[in-house]
Amino acid sequence: MGATHTIWEDLLDDTSFGLFALHCQSEDHCLAYALNAACGLSLSRTPKDLELGNCACFPVFQWKDEAHFQEWTLFRNTGLSLVAGASGGLFPDQPSEVRHYLVPERREVDYFLKVEGDEDPPGLLDRLLSIPRLVTAYRLDASGLKSKHNLIY
């Protein structure tokens, strides 16, 4: 006989991480470099991007802080995918780009910084706001997001 395994909803609703919204027009690698310098991190690009279905890929930067038992993840909120040209358009043979959002209910946010671990480091928000490339940064309540499951990497 085969065993049936179920996933408890509590595990999917686990939001025991800090989430910060970052508004920044810089490229993702430039922002990761600025975060590393300002916050003492070592974020690096993961070999594999976060894929949502077959529609879009989102770059991810990650760092595991073994000393403080924390895991830091930087997500870009927007991803582009190419779609075959629509018939009847001006350029029917050319593919067009479609913009997708990792967290669609927060389209105004450019990046998300997720901090998993015991607690956020003291003064983190002040250090984020001191980065000249950042327009603004603020803490978000992940439990209120409909698509928080997209942030599980």
Question: Language-model features: where?
Answer:
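Short, flexible, solvent-exposed loop/turn segments with mixed acidic/basic and small polar residues
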Residues: 5-13, 97-107
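Short N-terminal or domain-adjacent regulatory/targeting segments
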Residues: 1-8, 87-97
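Short, surface-exposed beta-strand/loop "edge" segments at domain boundaries and coil↔beta transitions
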Residues: 26-33, 67-71, 119-125
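Surface-exposed, low-hydrophobicity interaction/linker segments
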Residues: 52-95
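Glycine-rich, aromatic-bearing surface loops/beta-hairpins
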Residues: 100, 110-153
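Aromatic- and glycine-enriched beta-alpha-beta binding-site module
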Residues: 23-63
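Terminal, regulation- and interaction-focused segments at domain boundaries
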Residues: 9-26
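Short, surface-exposed beta-edge/turn micro-motifs
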Residues: 16-19, 107-112
